Amino acid sequence: MLEIARTAFLREGYAAASMSEIAAKVGGSKATLYSYFPSKKDLFAAVIEEEVQQMLAPLFEMDETQGDVRTVLERFARRFLDLLLTEDTVAFYRLIVAESARFPEIGQAAYQIGVQHGLDHLAGYFLAAMERGELRRADASVAVAQFLDLCSGELHRKRLFGVVGADDRDEVEKQVRNAVATFLAAYGAVQARAARLRSSAP
């Protein structure tokens, strides 16, 4: 059911997708579809949640205990970009952005289900790294948002405009190295030690 709805939303857009047509392709009645999903918004939210879970699964399966903070962040950034640049992710991103102007609840749902979930997961790692002295103590939620923006950056914009493809490894590796280096220049262990020295100074 969700796969059929997913195809309809990507092909027709949220506004034009018909619950009746989706029900017909599923093989049941419209009433049956509404018994599972009371509204088209609920169905779309379920599709987004399913899509996000599949997209983010490789990130949440990462073993964050293996390697120093630079290694872990580079591994995360690489997987994050690999997911962000896929055809499916780009298609859903464009769909959500296009529909959010008319249906702001769609954008809000996508943010809570996808973006916020990812932010919360990574914030847990950042907090632990701050406790270990590997990162400078700071607001973890702000640090995560800044790190993810550094990861996506210009490469994501190029992908959305069709300048690069999903499998441009040289561009991905360049973005990963630059993002992690810039982030650690602000939040890394040297900055953490300097902050501790300042706080202990008479």
Predicted regions and their residues:
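Short, structured helix-loop boundary elements
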Residues: 19, 41, 45, 66, ...
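Short hydrophobic clusters on alpha-helical segments that form packing/core surfaces
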Residues: 1-9, 80, 183
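C-terminal peripheral helix-coil segments that are non-catalytic and often amphipathic
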Residues: 71, 75, 79-81, 120, ...
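Membrane-interface starts of transmembrane alpha-helices
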Residues: 136, 140-144
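Short secondary-structure transition hinges
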Residues: 56, 82-127, 169
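Amphipathic alpha-helical linker/stalk segments
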Residues: 47-76, 84, 88, 122, ...
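Helix-turn-helix
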Residues: 4-42, 46-47
